[in-house]
Amino acid sequence: MHRRQFFQEYRSPQQQQGHPPRSEYQVLEEIGRGSFGSVRKVIHIPTKKLLVRKDIKYGHMNSKERQQLIAECSILSQLKHENIVEFYNWDFDEQKEVLYLYMEYCSRGDLSQMIKHYKQEHKYIPEKIVWGILAQLLTALYKCHYGVELPTLTTIYDRMKPPVKGKNIVIHRDLKPGNIFLSYDDSDYNINEQVDGHEEVNSNYYRDHRVNSGKRGSPMDYSQVVVKLGDFGLAKSLETSIQFATTYVGTPYYMSPEVLMDQPYSPLSDIWSLGCVIFEMCSLHPPFQAKNYLELQTKIKNGKCDTVPEYYSRGLNAIIHSMIDVNLRTRPSTFELLQDIQIRTARKSLQLERFERKLLDYENELTNIEKILEKQAIEYERELSQLKEQFTQAVEERAREVISGKKVGKVPESINGYYGKKFAKPAYHWQTRYR
């Protein structure tokens, strides 16, 4: 198939109608660049939402790589979850041979930047933040691995029932800090920042109007971030939980032993990668380090790594090493990890914090509405006072005209919204009384 015709069968409804989706977006600035293209910050003009657009050049891709692009579009469009980067739309330019993916904008960067920040500050990431991020990633993987939503916790002592697996399950296959994005709470304005005014928006607006030191904390405050799992370009969708993938993909530092040994693998490979990510959050370096790929491969196959620093609890250390387990029979699944009491405690804490923040948001919203209503009441009182004064002046003027013997003119049809009929009776009263 000719490269320019590759995406013809995948045309979106807008393209079929002759209106490409990219015409609805305004590009603000480039925020990243990779081997296949760039990442740009854009505004969806009709809704004025701040989004991200991935510009992917497919002209030099082989058939396998182009199929991965289609797979990413398909997977992202199906995965709707608060801890997964939301996919909005896609489009392509046949002349430039570029595919455009429109996705949620995560304003706090990614987990690798967070780890780098703490490493530069020579500080450990607080354990509460580590548990919170682990709990959020597990809820995202639960959606991927079972194809269903994770039930909300009522209490931390709730016992989960084994999930009824959905039709399709997804293995991410490239779980690493750079693919884990950070944002604010859903009630914040990370993708809903509104732009007042015109369709054309100055890109400096978003440099000057970021949510930073307000109720969400400083730019480097990670205590209230929401984790978003993204970059599903290497993900594989399996029709049933019995199927195993065999393709060799992923990032070496976070790659599971079964992938390295070219063996069939399952969602448990994502658990291994997640364990490596959480280990790096605690130790500020990957669990397996080597001077060359062969040495790294040997270390991963053996599965031997150091414990996390003593700054962290034994419980956290234990759950990390349970995920970095070479034995697939003893490596826990997403469901089993979510049964852990500390994970449940972290989940419940996140639920309560989110509920509290929403209450504060509603309180602030009500306060703002109250201020607006008070301002409007003052304005209405002022206007009413002016109307009363004008009414009194009009009546007195007509009374003076009658007393002086002048002919009373026609009452004006309206004075600032008061119609002539309302003035007609008082004017007639004065006219007959003093005749």
Swiss-Prot record:
Pfam families xref list: Pkinase (PF00069)
Entry superkingdom: Eukaryota
Domain Protein kinase: 25-343
EC number: 2.7.11.1
EC primary class: transferase
SMART domains in UniProt: S_TKc (SM00220)
InterPro entries for this protein: Kinase-like_dom_sf, NEK_Ser/Thr_kinase, Prot_kinase_dom, Protein_kinase_ATP_BS, Ser/Thr_kinase_AS
Gene3D superfamilies associated with the record: Phosphorylase Kinase, domain 1, Transferase(Phosphotransferase) domain 1
Catalyses which reaction(s): L-seryl-[protein] + ATP = O-phospho-L-seryl-[protein] + ADP + H(+); L-threonyl-[protein] + ATP = O-phospho-L-threonyl-[protein] + ADP + H(+)
Keywords: ATP-binding, Kinase, Nucleotide-binding, Serine/threonine-protein kinase, Transferase
GO MF term (any one): protein serine/threonine kinase activity
Positions contributing to ATP binding: 31-39, 54
One GO CC term, this protein: mitotic spindle pole body
Residue numbers spanned by region Disordered: 1-22
GO biological process, one term: chromosome segregation
Positions annotated as active site in the UniProt record: 174
Record family assignment: Belongs to the protein kinase superfamily. Ser/Thr protein kinase family.
Record's function text: This protein is probably a serine/threonine protein kinase.
Name of the protein described by the UniProt record: Serine/threonine-protein kinase KIN3
Organism, scientific name: Saccharomyces cerevisiae (strain ATCC 204508 / S288c)
Gene (UniProt): KIN3
